[in-house]
Amino acid sequence: MLFLLPAMLCADQEYLEVTASADRKIALAVAPPVSQGGGENSEITRNASDALRFDMELSGRFTILDATRAGGISGIRPGEFDLAPWRAAGAEYLIKSAYLLNGESTIMEFRLYDVTSGRQLLAKRYSGKNKDARKMAHSFSDEILLLQTKEKGPFTGKIAFVSKKSGNKEIYLMDYDGHNVQRITANGSINLNPDFSPNGREIIYTSYKKGNSNLYRRDLFSTAEARISAHPGINITGRWSPDGSRIALALSKDGNAEIYAISKDGRQLTRLTRTGAIETSPAWSPDGGKIAFLSDRLGKPQIFVMNANGSDPYRLTTSGDYNVSPSWSPKGDRILYCRQHSGGFQIHSITPDGNDDLQLTSEGSNEHPRWSPDGRFITFSSTRGGGQSIYVMRADGSGQTRVSRSGNSDSHPVWSPRW
């Protein structure tokens, strides 16, 4: 468990917002954490520094300087160190941090400085286990984005994904940057399409562990699990509604695959499409009023949008012969999907009215796009570099970075709400 202690300082928010609003990236130095007592721990130093640098680089707002020790290893509070060496190294902003060890527990303190003016902009202190150093750093990164943009970052979130690292397709969980991987399922079968509940405590997923492709709901903190949809045929591509009360999914209990909505306990079922075509992969709009989905009602797979009660469907994608895997931005302004190109799939982003279609990827075959909870980043799977791995990128397609390292067919990522 990670605890946020009372904030020590939060100053000059207006100044940081104005500075960060420019297109130019800010030169940022990240000083390695220093010990304030209880001994030294090289893992804390390395993990916190690496996490901060990764977060700030992905944010797209900073250029990370290779000047980690420009100012030596002096203190972190105002007046305890000299900003001049950092200024000489070209830093505009500086993150300083320290830790206080007490056995397996630690208190970490982070501070953000404007090197040019000498002002401290932000300070936070966290308490947790030594192994939580990365999470503490991610929490501070979230606060930096909050200070810049008035919205917290998504860096404390997790990514659930499917991997064959055990030999079968099982569900795993990892930090969004690929660290702290843990296995969620261990049934030796095929498990697919994880999706987080809005509060992040539960996931739903499809499993063939009983022979049929049934939908399950699992509590990530207690491991309690319930089978919520086991109709004959497929029970696949489940997605939580934004309020957590319903789940949209595809069922083939009456023949072809159609879109349904069920209550989260599986007791109430409502059919939403009735076309006789194959229709799967529902994706809710953030207000819960609409659903994007895949349909071949016109002969080839395309993305459609309908009201959440199934009424007034319209075709979203009009280019490409094979478009799949819609994902609606939490901001409501874009929908991701995958289009088949020569050589594989590529991820596109389009407005809900079908305009401004942008191709975001080009290297390898790229699938399963999902948004971060703030809508500023995307996670997806890609075959670039051999095998299939999980990547993250910014919403405009820049900053594409590999985060999973198993090399064992990692796919179907989904980014959790903030933990």
Predicted stretch roles:
Residues 175-192, 218-236, 262-280, 306-322, ...:
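Multi-bladed beta-propeller domains
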Residues 159, 203, 244-248, 288-292, ...:
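Hydrophobic beta-strand positions that form the internal "hydrophobic ladder"
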Residues 14, 77-143:
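Amphipathic beta-strand/beta-sheet edge segments enriched in Tyr/Trp
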Residues 105-107, 167-172, 212-216, 256-260, ...:
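Structural motif
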Residues 15-83, 95, 99:
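Short beta-strand->alpha-helix linker/helix-N-cap micro-motif
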Residues 153-155, 198-199, 242-243, 286-287, ...:
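Residue-level detector of Asp-centered blade-edge/turn motifs that repeat once per structural unit
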